[in-house]
Swiss-Prot record:
Enzyme class label: transferase
Residues involved in ATP binding: H17, D171, A172, K173, K237, F238, D246, R252, K253, A269, K273
Gene name of this polypeptide: metK
Binding site residues for K(+): E45
Cell cycle in keyword set: no
Name of this protein: S-adenosylmethionine synthase
Family: Belongs to the AdoMet synthase family.
Record's function text: Catalyzes the formation of S-adenosylmethionine (AdoMet) from methionine and ATP. The overall synthetic reaction is composed of two sequential steps, AdoMet formation and the subsequent tripolyphosphate hydrolysis which occurs prior to release of AdoMet from the enzyme.
Amino acid sequence: MARNNYLFTSESVSEGHPDKVCDRISDAILDAFLSEEPEARVACETFATTNRVVIGGEVGLSDQDKLAEYMGQVDPIVRACVKDIGYEQDKFHHETVEITNLLHEQSAHIAQGVDAAENKDEGAGDQGIMFGFAVAETPELMPAPIHYAHAILKKLAEVRKSGEQAVLGPDAKSQLSVRYEDGTPVGVSSIVLSTQHLDESLTSDDVRAIVEPYIRGELPDGWISAETEWHVNPTGKFVIGGPDGDAGLTGRKIIVDTYGGAAPHGGGAFSGKDPTKVDRSAAYASRYLAKNVVAAGLAHRCTIQLSYAIGVAKPLSIYCDTHQTGQVHEAEIERALGQVMDLTPRGIRTHLGMNRPIYERTAAYGHFGRAAEADGGFSWEKTDLADAIKAAL
């Protein structure tokens, strides 16, 4: 039986978190290759530590000369990312960081299983399971804890970059414990915020005085009470941050990237992967389907699972769970979803317009719950499939 009164906690990390620095770099490199060739194959991993960034993985372009040319663009892409994030500290600076590029051409054996032949649809780039989720807790149909944890850090990054609060550093984390009553989020029982600061003399109380107005401004009215616990920089000073403080890797913040633990995760990371990789494209499609089910009024809460096999085009299974909030049986929704959208890798990419350089912007503050953009960014957040789903039932 579902619980109605409880606390649920989610965390977010800022664009300057070491792992997010790596996600950003990997997706920026992906975008560069997609700008040259929409069908480019990219699997880019990044490692960052004190004074060093290492890039590795596989890339493929149809033009070998262009491939060599774009390999040479990795260094300025990395430096541009680090500069935009805001790192200019002694041991991690966009001008002086040492960059090692170990990218190489994609395996022909992988390519032959994925590429479309004359008599065969393009297959999935790997086996795997992917989940999508939506819930009518926020206008974006996202779980409230992760939505507001992201919002706080986005706001702090905004005021840092504008110069309004230049004393803040790029590295930060947030965590919210949200109180639910009758299944509805109504307040925050605790707030955890750790943020890098550039002035060594600042105390935890000083930092709280800086960030508290912005935190209050991002949360709904009435959510913070006298009983809300505040933990701002609870360990004291936080001056050394980013990859100089802790090493970073691409793909280590998969729960931050998705639903904050409110839904299952198939295990595959997103950043640095071109959309032939179903780890990414099918997870985006799953979110798209779940969001449209909720937007159609068919459920208050919806989880979708898709599964794939490498070299096989069609999904092996489509699963829907409306968590006892559905207006129709889940099996009927599953059948309808298979009718209204081509869920092969190419079908997903075509429907959502994914062969575009739209991924660097996804690397921080969540891949979901964002506004669809005019150039095709966050197309999986549209609710333009809702009527078709209802018509197919």
